[in-house]
Amino acid sequence: MKDWLFRIATCSIMTFSSLAAAQAEPLDVVATFSIIGDFAAKVGGDRIRLNVLVGPDSDTHVYEPRPADAIALAGADVVLTNGLEFEGFLTRLIAASGTDAAVATLTDGVETMEEPGGGHYHYIDGKAVFHAGAHDPHAWQAVPNAKVYVQNIAAAFCAADAEGCAAYQANAARYIGELDALDTEIRAAIAALPQDRRTVVVAHNAFRYFEAAYGVHFLSPQGVSTESEAAAADVAGLIREIRARNASAIFAENISDTRLLEQIAREAGLPLAGTLYSDALSGPDGPASNYIAMMRHNAGAIAAALAAR
């Protein structure tokens, strides 16, 4: 009797241990910034353990890696990156970490846009900081491109975890359905606006893919610094363009300094109409805590500001 009970107990323990071991080994995934992290979570679900390097409301262009980031990469199975020179820190971080993880570039397959000036500016502490790059990296700002990101993530996860491939593909298909509905929603919101009232001003040139997909024109103070001698003339030139194009609103961005935009708003006689989310999500309690919420917030804020003029 005791032997029988012992065998049952032993089998139960071994079975439980095997199941626990199977469930205790999720795919270790590193995503470079918050938007990609959200895509990864949607596709991976509970089969992945996710580490996001650049968090909400943070600028990936100027991010300085920490020792913990190298440790995360060293233990990763998959690293998800935007590519197009968006993550300037990543090459040296990969080298420092010694990781042998698969690196998936999520813009592969996207029809990318060239940077007209060989790069674009960010505004940090009132100064214009140039980010060089041959192609505009902000491809996620058009929802059809986000679908490519999601497909690439599913492919990367399937390559690293064949047993979970069906789950990854099902998650991706379900999420792509949500993205299709979002794309339709944004197109309808912008289509309701008059053609001559579709221009806004933003802090940096991060919305060209949104512009091409949805028909809103974005102006930005490229290269203007609040501390430069040429700032007054540059701002005056931008204000002339704002008036010529009948721009109706100025938006701050969650990752950019607002001082220059406040100056432009005063001189152009336009309101600061709110905040758009360009290169990072908001925190969990903000209006852009995931990609769909971010795009819905941006499109809604733009449509409301332009309709009110």
Swiss-Prot record:
Gene knockout outcome: No effect on growth and no effect on zinc cellular level in zinc repleted media. In zinc limited media, growth is reduced in a znuA mutant background and also in an znuA and aztD mutant background. In zinc depleted media, zinc cellular levels are reduced in a znuA mutant background, an aztD mutant background and a znuA and aztD mutant background.
Induction profile: Up-regulated upon zinc starvation.
GO-annotated cellular components: periplasmic space
Top-level taxonomic group: Bacteria
Spans annotated as D-loop: 117-132
Chief location category: periplasm
InterPro entries cross-referenced by the UniProt entry: AdhesinB (IPR006129), AztC-like (IPR047701), Bact_metal-bind_prot9 (IPR050492), Lipoprotein_PsaA-like (IPR006128), ZnuA-like (IPR006127)
Key words of the record: Disulfide bond, Ion transport, Metal-binding, Periplasm, Signal, Transport, Zinc, Zinc transport
Pfam families named among the record's database cross-references: ZnuA
Region (Z-loop): 222-229
GO molecular function: zinc ion binding
Disulfide partners: C158-C165
Subcellular location: Periplasm
Listed Gene3D superfamilies: Nitrogenase molybdenum iron protein domain
Binding of Zn(2+), residues: H61, H138, H204, D279
Record's signal peptide: 1-24
GO biological process, alphabetically ordered: cell adhesion; zinc ion transport
Function recorded in the entry: Part of the ATP-binding cassette (ABC) transport system AztABCD involved in zinc import. Binds zinc with high affinity and specificity and delivers it to the membrane permease for translocation into the cytoplasm.
Family: Belongs to the bacterial solute-binding protein 9 family.
Domain comment, as recorded: The D-loop is required for the efficient acquisition of Zn(2+) from chaperone AztD. The Z-loop functions to lock down over the zinc binding site, decreasing the rate of zinc dissociation. May also inhibit the formation of productive interactions with AztD for zinc transfer.
NCBIfam families named in the record: AztC
Subunit structure: Monomer.
Protein's name according to its UniProt entry: High-affinity zinc uptake system protein AztC
Organism of derivation: Paracoccus denitrificans (strain Pd 1222)
